[in-house]
C-alpha cells in the first residue's frame, strides 16, 4: 500500500528486486530495473526494461534489454530523453505522411467518381514533385526539431497504444480530409476549367495549394500537442523556404511551366491559394489547443 509513496529502497536483495518489479507492474507502471550480479537476472528479465551494468556478469547482460556500458546512472536519463524524442518524431513523421497520402487518395478518388478533369486533378509529374521534392523538407524539419523542455516531466506512454491507434488514424483522416478539401476548392474556384492537355489556372492553383498546404501543415505537425509555430522556429523556416521557392518557380518560371504544365497566377489567385493553404495549419493548431485545454 505504501509503494506509491516510497522512492528509495535500501539493502534490497535480488528477491526484493523481483517483488518490487512485479508489484509496480501490477499497478500499471513501466518498470526499469538495474543489476550487475548473476542473481539479479530474474528481476531484469521481469522488468519492462532490464538494464545491466557494463561491469556486470555475462548472465545479467544476457537477461537485460539494455547495457549501461559506462556504469553511470545519469546516462539512463539521457537515453530516456533521447528515446522519447525519437518516438515523438516518428509519430509526427507518420502523421504528416499519412495525412498527405490520404489527401491525395481522396483527391483522385473524388475526381474519378465525379469526372473532374477526367479523373486527373493533378498531373503525374505534379504528384511526383509534391511527393519527392516538397514533402522532404517538412520531414527534415520534423526530424531536426529539438525535444521540448518538458519532455522528461511527461508520463510514460502506454505501451499498449500503437502508432496506428484509432485516435491517431482519426487525426490522420481529419488532416487529410482538410487538405483534400482545400485542394479541391482551389480546383473548383479557379476562373477556368482544368484540362489534361493544356496548362490552366485551375490545375496550377490546385498544385500550389497542395504544395503550400503540405509545407505549412508540416510546420504545424512537427510537434504535438505543443504549437508548431512556437520557438525555436527560425531553423524550420529556413528549411521550409526552399520548397516554397520551388513551388513558386514551378508556376511562374517559363521552362518549369512547360515541364509541369502550369501557368502564371494573378495576384488575387495567389491570395486565394495562400488563404486556402492556411486552412490546414489553422485546423491543426485548433485541434491541439482544444486537447491542451482539455488535458488541464
Description of each model-found segment:
Residues 214-218, 280-289:
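Alpha-helical transmembrane segments
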Residues 1-32, 47, 54-226:
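Membrane-embedded transport module
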Residues 229-238:
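Cytoplasmic-side transmembrane-helix entry/capping segments in multi-pass membrane proteins
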Residues 182-186, 244-258:
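Hydrophobic alpha-helical transmembrane segments in multi-pass integral membrane proteins
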